[in-house]
């Protein structure tokens, strides 16, 4: 995905409501398969890009693209609001504390600038919007760069390890597709 100072927003459900420390993981390498596998990318390097600013919000219970949330926390990277990202780089954000009440979503927002930024076709996985700075505000976008993992520091009863990813599950390998391939094998 190429972006010239584009601000993206995506709403994510949280596993547990309340105040927690969150961290966000990023990979600037693409491993992806689409459709029947004839279109796939293995170890494809992302481009150089800049994270100009990132913020998380209590996203509320509604998906209003142009809402101005009141509860927010700035996301930083090694103490800085901005980050230059190199091809194939992997990194975590610093921890950020946010209170997301029961039934609310975590709203991820960031402004990025650069070329070949790894992005995902979100379709019906989450509400995703982009503001290109053209005065039109946030408009729906199907292809959006987002963190690869949202981590939450909370007490757990047990740890579970899973193997596989969206491809092995057949999730979003075609538009609105959920084939659950692992269950079919």
Language model: regions and residue ranges:
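Phosphate-binding active sites in nucleotide-utilizing proteins
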Residues: 158, 176-185
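N-terminal secretory targeting modules
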Residues: 1-163, 168-175
């Amino acid at each position: 995905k190429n972006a010239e100072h584009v601000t993206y927003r995506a709403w994510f459900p949280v596993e547990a409501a309340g105040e927690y420390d969150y961290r966000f993981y990023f990979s600037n390498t693409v491993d992806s398969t689409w459709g029947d596998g004839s279109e796939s990318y293995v170890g494809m390097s992302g481009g150089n890009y800049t994270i100009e600013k990132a913020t998380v919000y209590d996203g509320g219970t509604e998906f209003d693209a142009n809402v101005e949330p009141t509860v927010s926390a700035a996301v930083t990277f090694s103490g800085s609001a901005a980050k230059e990202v190199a091809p194939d780089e992997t990194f975590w954000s610093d921890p950020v504390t946010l209170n997301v009440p029961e039934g609310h979503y975590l709203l991820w927002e960031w402004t990025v600038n650069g070329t070949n930024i790894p992005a995902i076709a979100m379709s019906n996985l989450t509400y995703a919007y982009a503001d290109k700075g053209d005065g039109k505000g946030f408009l729906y976008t199907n292809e959006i760069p987002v963190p690869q993992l949202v981590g939450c520091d909370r007490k757990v009863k047990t740890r579970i390890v899973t193997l596989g990813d969206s491809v092995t599950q057949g999730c979003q390998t075609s538009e609105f597709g959920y084939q659950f391939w692992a269950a079919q094998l």
